[in-house]
Amino acid sequence: MKLPIIFLTLLIFVSSCTSVLINGSSDEERTYSFSPRASPFDPRSLNQELKIGRIGYCFDCARACMRRGKYIRTCSFERKLCRYSISDIK
């Protein structure tokens, strides 16, 4: 009878300690520093990311137009605008 009681007591103690440790580690404030020497900023890579996003958005716009059976009329990444033509694809 003593063995199950000791086991349950240890289980409760261990579970309470782990929950305290988990809550303590998640409450810590995390700071991220940027070191230009360690990782230099490359504006061309940012420009490439924007181009990829623009191409991806317009590609999705074109697919949506084709699903409707229409031609693509306007695709504006900056304004998030996708318009298709009135005429159907022949």
UniProtKB/Swiss-Prot annotation:
Tissue: Expressed in the pistil. Detected exclusively in the synergid cells.
Localization (cell): Secreted
Principal subcellular localization: secreted
Keyword Disulfide bond in record: yes
Signal sequence region: 1-19
Alphabetized UniProt keyword annotations: Disulfide bond, Secreted, Signal
GO cellular component: extracellular region
Coiled-coil positions: none
Disulphides: 58-75, 61-82
Spans through the membrane: none
UniProt cross-references to InterPro entries, sorted A to Z: DEFL_AtLURE1-like
Outcome after substituting residue 84 to C: Gain of pollen tube attraction activity
General function of this protein: Inactive pollen tube attractants guiding pollen tubes to the ovular micropyle.
Family: Belongs to the DEFL family.
Protein name from the UniProt record: Protein LURE 1.5
Species of the source: Arabidopsis thaliana (Mouse-ear cress)
